[in-house]
Amino acid sequence: MNDQLTEVYASIDALIDYALAHLDLDPRNADWTRNQIFALFRLDSYPGPKTTTSAASVSDVVQDIVGSRSQAPYGEKTPDPLLAAFRAAATTAGLFKPEEGPAYADTIMGILSANPADLDDRFLLVEHRDGGMAAMQWFYDYCVSNNYVKRAQLDRNPRFDSHGLTVTINLAKPEFKNMKKAAAGNAVAGGYPKCTICHENEGFAGRDKRTLRTLPVTLGGESWFWQFSPYGYFDQHGICVNTDHTPMHVDRDTFGHLLDFVDRFPGYFLGCNAALPRIGGSVLAHDHYQGGGELLPMHKAATWAAFTLADYPDAVVEILDWPGTAVRVVSKSRQSIIDVTDIIREAWVGYDDAANGIASHDADGNRQSALSPSAIITERGYEMSLIFRNNAISDEYQIGRASCRERV
């Protein structure tokens, strides 16, 4: 066996050791898992881990990972250095071309990762023992460790916090600005999966989703699932997706869904974009919410006025000191939060004010107004923040305009 293959075997051994330490790989499955990786490249001359001549170099790689812990938040829990060592060894040995490295790395990490059912079982054990937030932290750490969440890239994103606002520049995440693509949900060529966030993407090689793992979540008695974003905008950014491929919408049920989620995971927020082009998300064909473990600036924004509705004395509506038109509904009562929020939604989506250029529908009767809600739990109870959105365009505002507080 030549030295080049020796380096390949040593790098694979290092990845197996990493999976044993960080991906809950059962030692009884180590040989079986190693052989799956060997099969990718038709490797059949493995000398065994104790007889490789590259033990020192592999040890150095592992030490480099441990040593980087002070510089990177997740340190040794990220496999990037080991994957880099494998890719370098494999390309030198002629197993694949350099440009094929990312796909093979994704394949190997998918092999090393636990299957979805086992992962869900472990999540439920942690949740039963330590609570929903501890279970989410465990799941997030796992998704970092199996390289689905790209911590190495996220840690390089610029971030600016000042005057109650946060600006992040996501250098890695692809964005879709084309409205037709948004309406189609960024449909995939071939029709499978139906869109980029369908549950069928879990483990799908066609979009390099071999390491994607999801968790089932019940919202409003319906089947949804949670997954973390590989290129999140904030801490523990994830999406909660309807298991059925159904279009985005915001209605009364939406508010109950958001509260169901924060009841189970009270340290997270959950919200959604307005379900309209230009002011909505990049995937409108599939109903989904976004949330995570970091309160957004709007959740902490001060208020400049507050009032109550006569029929709901246990709920307070606060007008936020915010660049856009936004209010916050606060109550310890789930029912009051849902009722008051839906009253506001119905009023806004039908609101017209020609003097201020606000039209709820365009000339063809298409709806133009919508809400972007997000829910959190605080010591005050439930808090539902609502951003008033309108996607109207004109010759003067060809890409639309924000509905500003001063004009409403």
Residue ranges and their predicted role:
Residues 1-247, 323, 338, 347-407:
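Active-site microenvironments that recognize anionic phosphate/pyrophosphate groups
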Residues 196-201, 259, 270-272, 301-304, ...:
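Short C-terminal domain-edge/linker segments immediately following a structured domain
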Residues 236-237, 242, 280-296, 385-387:
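Histidine-centered divalent-metal-coordination microenvironment in nucleic-acid enzymes
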